[in-house]
């Protein structure tokens, strides 16, 4: 019986170690991108206040669209409503007001430029008659969860909602990976913005 318990304990310990190592690797990989990646900035909208995970992160929405380019391979992904995993090419400073711009979308990186993989996209049509129709453009969905201090979540959420017309999502891109590293309100990082509001209510 003791030997059986020892084996069970060893198996449980090994499982926990694997989970801890995997979690640690995710953190290391995130920090590597967040600290050394190319900065890309997109206008964003506030999270959904009915989100059941409110208090753990803010949910944002970035609305980006890019015209269809027949040179970029799509395979069979043409359904007008279905999201598909995509790669996007980004011009970090190609948009208006110092924002970034998505310049291409495909199933995988193709050609030079700053590419981010693992994002979602949806084909859009002005007139859809069948699966062989080329889309007119793509809607691109970027990472949308910004994790934060739970004690400040409600306050950050209120401030973010009130200031959403001047909100910018700051991403970092490195080696094809894209992470949401910060949110700016009126050009100020969210945590700093809150500290200033607290100091001068």
Regions found by a protein language model. Give the residues of each.
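Extracytoplasmic/periplasmic terminal helices and flexible tails
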Residues: 100-104, 116-201
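Extracellular/lumenal and peripheral-membrane lipid-interaction modules
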Residues: 29, 51, 63, 164, ...
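Short nucleic-acid-contacting surface segments enriched for D/E, G, S/T with interspersed K/R
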Residues: 53-56, 74-86, 155-167
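Short, Lys/Arg-rich N-terminal segment immediately upstream of the first membrane anchor
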Residues: 1-6
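Hydrophobic membrane-insertion alpha-helices, especially the h-region
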Residues: 7-29
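Aromatic-capped interface at the extracytoplasmic side
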Residues: 22-44
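Structured domain cores in non-transmembrane regions
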Residues: 66-127
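Short extracytoplasmic
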Residues: 42-74
């Amino acid at each position: 019986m003791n030997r059986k318990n020892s084996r069970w304990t060893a198996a449980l310990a090994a499982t926990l170690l694997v989970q801890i190592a995997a979690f640690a690797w995710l953190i290391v990989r995130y920090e590597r991108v967040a600290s050394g990646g190319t900065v890309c900035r997109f206008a964003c909208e506030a999270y959904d206040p009915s989100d059941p995970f409110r208090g753990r992160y803010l949910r944002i929405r970035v609305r980006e669209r890019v015209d269809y380019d027949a040179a970029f391979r799509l395979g069979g992904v043409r359904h007008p409503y279905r999201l598909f995993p995509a790669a996007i090419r980004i011009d970090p400073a190609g948009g208006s007001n110092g924002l970034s711009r998505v310049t291409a979308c495909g199933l995988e990186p193709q050609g030079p430029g700053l590419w981010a993989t693992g994002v979602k996209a949806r084909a859009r049509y002005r007139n859809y008659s069948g699966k062989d129709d080329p889309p007119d453009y793509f809607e691109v969905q970027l990472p949308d969860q910004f994790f934060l201090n739970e004690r400040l979540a409600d306050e950050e959420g209120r401030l973010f909602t009130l200031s959403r017309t001047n909100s910018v999502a700051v991403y970092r891109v490195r080696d094809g990976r894209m992470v949401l590293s910060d949110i700016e309100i009126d050009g100020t990082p969210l945590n700093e913005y809150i500290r200033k509001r607290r100091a001068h209510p």
